[in-house]
Amino acid sequence: MALKSFNPTTPSQRQLVIVSRAGLYKGKPVKTLTEGLSSKGGRNNLGRITVRFQGGGHKRTYRLVDFKRRKFDVEGTVERLEYDPNRTAFIALVNYADGEQAYILAPQRLAVGDKVIASEKAVDVKPGNAMPLQFIPVGSIIHNVEMKPGKGGQIARSAGTYAQLVGRDQGMAILRLNSGEQRLVHGSCLASIGAVSNPDHGNINDGKAGRSRWRGKRPHVRGVVMNPVDHPHGGGEGRTSGGRHPVTPWGKPTKGKRTRSNKSTDKFIMRSRHQRKK
């Protein structure tokens, strides 16, 4: 999909750059593959804000996307590509040979009419096909990678993202991720071939604040412009730098502070994403 810019009839139109959706289906999603989605506005069940700067936005219908790809050895045909408001990537509606339908993440270069298949054995290395990592050729570009067999894809699901299979070692696959991290994943975990669709997502320009509001994003207020009652960086006469190392509103270090605490899975990370920055 190409990028689309507009004639500068207003200041926001001048700056607006969006992804063209010319090749996407214009109708409604398949009703049996959707669910209702209520807007939480960043609140929990007590009505308290747990995520700041969220609220409003357009009403959405949730599309049930198949991240597990457990329909083995049944060929499917891509009926159409669709926009999904709940994610940055596009999705594809697949009609399987037995009559079932499912949404999958659409990879790049997947077109209407293409055949896709998921299997526990080796299948063709072409976009949209899914198979265990132990059967995928080394060097392949993959997405929607499982971290535990049968759990469903968790790695490389955003627009334009991918992982690369760089090797194998004692039943484990070695993956290089977009972040630069190299990690081990069990060879029986499924992965889909190709990179995720909509790689131009990173080049869009909203053009105006209202477009963020349509997505349910409210203004993100800095701590240094608040009062002391609201934030540790607040207060002071005139503009200040905060006067201390960056902290959250609750006084915890932030901006570069390491937050990873799951030491039991450290052994699967061969090269940290932070290493290249040293």
UniProtKB/Swiss-Prot annotation:
Protein name in the entry: Large ribosomal subunit protein uL2
Originating gene: rplB
Start and end residues of each stretch annotated as Disordered: 201-278
Gene3D superfamilies: 2.30.30.30, Nucleic acid-binding proteins, Ribosomal protein L2, domain 3
InterPro entries named among the record's database cross-references: NA-bd_OB-fold, Rib_uL2_dom2, Ribosomal_uL2, Ribosomal_uL2_bac/org-type, Ribosomal_uL2_C, Ribosomal_uL2_CS, Ribosomal_uL2_dom3, Ribosomal_uL2_RNA-bd_dom
Organism: Rhizobium meliloti (strain 1021) (Ensifer meliloti)
Free-text function comment from the UniProt entry: One of the primary rRNA binding proteins. Required for association of the 30S and 50S subunits to form the 70S ribosome, for tRNA binding and peptide bond formation. It has been suggested to have peptidyltransferase activity; this is somewhat controversial. Makes several contacts with the 16S rRNA in the 70S ribosome.
Stored HAMAP family: Ribosomal_uL2_B
Sequence ranges of Basic residues compositional bias: 210-221
UniProt xrefs under NCBIfam families: rplB_bact (TIGR01171)
Source domain of life: Bacteria
Cellular component annotations (GO), alphabetically ordered: large ribosomal subunit
GO-annotated molecular function: rRNA binding; structural constituent of ribosome; transferase activity
Keywords from the named record: Ribonucleoprotein, Ribosomal protein, RNA-binding, rRNA-binding
Assembly notes: Part of the 50S ribosomal subunit. Forms a bridge to the 30S subunit in the 70S ribosome.
Biological process terms in GO annotation: cytoplasmic translation
Pfam families: Ribosomal_L2, Ribosomal_L2_C
UniProt family annotation: Belongs to the universal ribosomal protein uL2 family.
